[in-house]
Amino acid sequence: MLRRRGSPGMGVHVGAALGALWFCLTGALEVQVPEDPVVALVGTDATLCCSFSPEPGFSLAQLNLIWQLTDTKQLVHSFAEGQDQGSAYANRTALFPDLLAQGNASLRLQRVRVADEGSFTCFVSIRDFGSAAVSLQVAAPYSKPSMTLEPNKDLRPGDTVTITCSSYQGYPEAEVFWQDGQGVPLTGNVTTSQMANEQGLFDVHSILRVVLGANGTYSCLVRNPVLQQDAHSSVTITPQRSPTGAVEVQVPEDPVVALVGTDATLRCSFSPEPGFSLAQLNLIWQLTDTKQLVHSFTEGRDQGSAYANRTALFPDLLAQGNASLRLQRVRVADEGSFTCFVSIRDFGSAAVSLQVAAPYSKPSMTLEPNKDLRPGDTVTITCSSYRGYPEAEVFWQDGQGVPLTGNVTTSQMANEQGLFDVHSVLRVVLGANGTYSCLVRNPVLQQDAHGSVTITGQPMTFPPEALWVTVGLSVCLIALLVALAFVCWRKIKQSCEEENAGAEDQDGEGEGSKTALQPLKHSDSKEDDGQEIA
């Protein structure tokens, strides 16, 4: 346990010692803080909650409590051996002394500033040691935006106006959104700047440039991302002279189709009145959705291109009512709707669509596996076509023209220019012969790119190794059969010989018995003869 000796400045040394204990002790004492950041408004007071569970018989004389900045280890407030050591943080911090004995080690931070934002660590030491960090998120609401126009008088349809939206004294940096009267977001021709003052609070200035229509409402929304608080403001601009429809602007009904890398002409025309002078003409081309300026002609002078210097008018034809725009080196990103604004005494506008396209390359066909193919093998056929736009339609068919839709997987990926590379994979089981065709179609150009492959499966044949193995096995089998036949023949022959030998033995025994019987007959006959003689 740390003990305080000497001057009150010992609190700093206690903080250093506890900082060392951070690395040495196990933190058996459980210290609890909120998981979510504490959000505090600038100028208000904030409470950084911290608590621990005191053991029975706990005394404040045993408590050492340190609050410090987590990153810099700067001391904020300390309590040691039963005494509050006070604040080292501009005298703006305080503990809750009446609640310390209950385990409440929370810190009250007064008159919060932007610079206070960050992480604070609560160190608690009794017999054991514990610590935890809590985050402070500072915020300040933004003021209601003010809207200004430049120019702000004598406005006519077709004029270009700069609208500035300003909001002050907020924190952190704001998110700014513009939209028109129909709620459509406006992202083109917007410039936003944010600058912090001495207190760290931000002033926001967002500028939108638009071409006026008959009537227009423009809204600015400034959002505080921490407070999720929105500050709104809007302005409605009504030009002094409403359009009478005298200026009829004509554009094609169908989209203009242009190939990537070529030039496209977006046609727009109007009917000039007698005595018309180019000094009276205000002509604006802009993107319909985002209102981004593309090209302008004002008071008899071409103001040039604000579209990467790729646009031009037809100056020799303007006096005849030709307000067409030439767009050079078309890109995929150019696709969309362009609005042609014409203002003389009256006003008119119309929108024309640009459809970008790029033909697909002739498909290349690859096989996997690509050799030693036999009927019945499964083969993967890949059809690849490159640098087309928009996304392609892919069709497969066999040699008889039958569509193949099963086991087909197609992927399309755009490169940095927005052009698509197409890879379509077909898995098939080979027959004796097979032709497979891949068709890649551009839906805008209605252009088809074909590729095909004919696969002839090799007939079933035995390799030389298999033939020699078969011959060897056949010879071995024949030899085995011959050997078996020979053994059987020997067995049969031996059996026959044994039977013949047995038969001869029986015949010899029969003859011997007959010979033995014959002398008996002779003796009997002699006896008979002797009897007779007697």
From Swiss-Prot:
Write down the Pfam families for this protein, in alphabetical order.
Answer: C2-set_3 (PF22705), V-set (PF07686)
Keywords recorded for this protein, A-Z:
Disulfide bond, Glycoprotein, Immunoglobulin domain, Membrane, Phosphoprotein, Repeat, Signal, Transmembrane, Transmembrane helix
* UniProt keyword Amino-acid biosynthesis, yes or no: no
GO terms for MF = signaling receptor binding
Localization of this protein: Membrane
Q: Where is this region: Disordered?
A: 498-534
What is the tissue localization of expression for this protein? Ubiquitous but not detectable in peripheral blood lymphocytes or granulocytes. Weakly expressed in resting monocytes. Expressed in dendritic cells derived from monocytes. Expressed in epithelial cells of sinonasal tissue. Expressed in extravillous trophoblast cells and Hofbauer cells of the first trimester placenta and term placenta.
Which positions does the record annotate as the modified residue Phosphoserine? 525
Q: Record keywords: Heme included? A: no
In the record, the note on similarity to other proteins reads:
Belongs to the immunoglobulin superfamily. BTN/MOG family.
List the protein's name.
CD276 antigen
Organism whose genome encodes this protein: Homo sapiens
Q: Which gene encodes it?
A: CD276
